[in-house]
Amino acid sequence: AFLRFDYSGHGASSEVFTDGCVGDWAEDAQAAIEVLTQGKQILVGSSMGGWISMLMAQRLPDRLAGLVTIAAAPDFTEDGFWASFNEDTRRLLLQEGVVNIPSDYGDPYPITKRLIEDGRSHLVLRKPLSLPFPVRLLQGDEDVDVSVELANTLFSHIKGPDVQLRLLKGADHRFST
């Protein structure tokens, strides 16, 4: 059996994306694991879900048997969005509370001040990340959203007895090519 769900504000959920943040989505995941599953779980997280899975590994290590990430995007609010914003964009975000950034997947992404600020409370690459179970990091070499360099950084950062990085030739961010 497996459990799949959409974070609040994502996919088929009824909430609005701009109302959420990393902490909220981590709470969604933790509640789903604690309420809807029994025994040890293998988490599979793609992109932001990879980051959330790492937060679950820190919060619920005794409930996990393994972790698989696909194009994991840990700390993307800080190292991706905030780091790439110029001074004008940062000022606009702080004043208006939201900026819209272009997306290759449809409508622009509304990035909120709350998303950026809350993300800073959940960064996983700035402190030790010990994962005592098997970890498989899957990364496409044609991913333009999460670089192979970030996958290598994550691989080097994780401490554990069984951590592997698998680079897939020709795969994009969504592993659709």
Feature map (PLM): residue ranges:
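Active-site nucleophile elbow and catalytic-triad environment of alpha/beta-hydrolase enzymes
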Residues: 108-128, 133
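Gly/Ala-rich beta-loop-alpha elbow adjacent to hydrolase catalytic centers
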Residues: 45-49, 53
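Catalytic histidine-centered segment of alpha/beta-hydrolase-like enzymes
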Residues: 171-177
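Hydrolase active-site cap/lid region
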Residues: 62-111
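Short beta-strand/loop motif that positions the catalytic acidic residue
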Residues: 131, 137-139, 143
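Alpha/beta-hydrolase active-site loop
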Residues: 19-36
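Conserved alpha/beta-hydrolase
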Residues: 1-12
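Conserved alpha/beta-hydrolase "acid-adjacent" motif
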Residues: 144-150
